[in-house]
Design a protein with these regions (language model features):
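Conserved donor-binding/catalytic core segment of Leloir-type glycosyltransferases
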Residues: 8-10, 163-181, 186-192, 204-207
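Glycosyltransferase donor-sugar binding loop
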Residues: 46, 203-217, 233
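Nucleotide-activated donor-binding/catalytic signature segment of Leloir-type glycosyltransferases, i.e.
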Residues: 216-236
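Acidic donor-binding loop of glycosyltransferase active sites
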Residues: 245-259, 273
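Conserved acidic donor-binding segment of nucleotide-sugar-dependent glycosyltransferases
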Residues: 289-290, 294-301, 310-316
């Protein structure tokens, strides 16, 4: 029987704010699931305070490292650069066991940029990565202790889906709002389709927190678009299914370098929405092209506009995909992955 009574999680909890980016949501989900599944005391070190209350974060970190043997970390790129050497020191000094739950999908690039990362990562008990592709790339760089745990969310997967759709077909984006997530690509595609048909064939609703660096540009953009495009604000991560379940499909034309296993795809599948996504990072590992969505560019579909037009003209196929989406969504419920995490910590 495990003797573990407490662990710590170092990650971005968002302070007292309602922050809904992927890093914060993943950190909160892990904390809540472990809290519900174990009797452990779980300490929180919130990296949200790095610029707002740096002395508090430093003190919380020192207390955590001196008093806790098992530490899970979920860190941004800058967080890794600060915490990796500190954790490595305490690992060697006190035998601290570090479990790295990776945010995003570009760790292999960081290892190439910062060669010291290789030793840090190999000294951790495990690196939980979000895709098999990243695991293989890291293995080629000499990182040998990776296990795949995809993004998971405890969502109420729909039991049935809508089978009746007509013009205008409603599409949505459900992610952080920034240019690199393909927001402008999606707007341009929908506007171009409607213009070419001479009527409103499709609509686009955009959900998510607008990235600080993109706010001015996005506000200006929304002043110029047609009424077919609208911004719907933010939705709590556990309310996503209810918010998007009536849409025809989700658009995910991302080209963001930090993309890992996008939680928005789990949201979409749980709501029975096929996903139209770029062939970017691990999207093709999750979305089955022509099975529960479209990965483009492919042999027949070269861009987002073509993908949307294909879906509009192949309604029967898209509706059949919705059943596959719901089946796939059940793979991303937390239970099995939380058991895997607990087993690893208790070893």
């Amino acid at each position: 029987m495990s003797q573990i009574k407490e662990i710590a999680i170092i990650g971005h909890f968002g302070g007292n704010e309602e922050i809904l980016d992927g890093q914060t949501v993943k950190t909160k989900i892990l904390y809540n699931e472990l809290k519900n599944a174990t009797g452990w005391k779980i300490k929180k070190v919130d990296t949200y305070y790095k610029s707002k209350k740096p002395l508090k974060l430093l003190w919380d970190t020192i207390k955590c490292l001196l008093t806790t043997k098992h530490i899970i970390i979920l860190l941004s790129r800058n967080g890794m650069r600060f915490y990796f050497p500190v954790l490595s020191f305490f690992l060697n000094l006190l035998g601290t066991k570090v479990y790295h739950d990776l945010i995003g999908g570009s760790l292999d690039k960081l290892v190439q940029q910062y060669p010291d990362f290789k030793d840090y990562l190999n000294n951790f008990k495990v690196n939980w990565v979000e895709s098999d592709g990243l695991k293989q790339r890291l293995y080629k760089l000499g990182i040998t202790n990776c296990e795949v745990i995809p993004n998971f969310k405890r969502l109420n997967v729909l039991s049935q889906y809508c089978e009746e759709y007509a013009e205008p077909y409603r599409f949505c984006i459900f992610s952080r709002v920034m240019k690199e997530k393909g927001v402008e690509t999606a707007i341009d595609a929908v506007e171009a389709i409607n213009k070419s048909f001479g009527r409103e064939v499709c609509k686009l609703d955009i959900y998510g927190r607008v990235d600080d660096s993109y706010k001015t540009r996005f506000e200006e953009l929304m002043q110029t678009v047609s009424s077919s495009i609208s911004y719907q604000g933010m939705v709590p991560y556990d309310k996503s299914v209810e918010a998007i379940k009536d849409y025809y499909a989700l658009l995910f034309p991302t080209y963001w370098d930090g993309e890992g296993f996008p939680g928005t795809i789990v949201d979409a599948f749980s709501a029975g929405l096929p996903v139209i996504a770029t062939n970017w990072n691990c999207n093709a590992e999750i979305v089955d092209d022509m099975g529960n969505g479209i990965i483009y560019p492919n042999e027949d579909i070269k861009n987002l506009r073509s993908a949307i037009e294909w879906c509009i003209s192949h309604k029967k196929e898209v509706i059949n995909w919705k059943k596959s989406c719901l089946e796939k969504a059940r793979e991303y419920q937390p239970d099995n992955y939380i058991k895997q995490i607990i087993r690893t910590i208790e070893e």
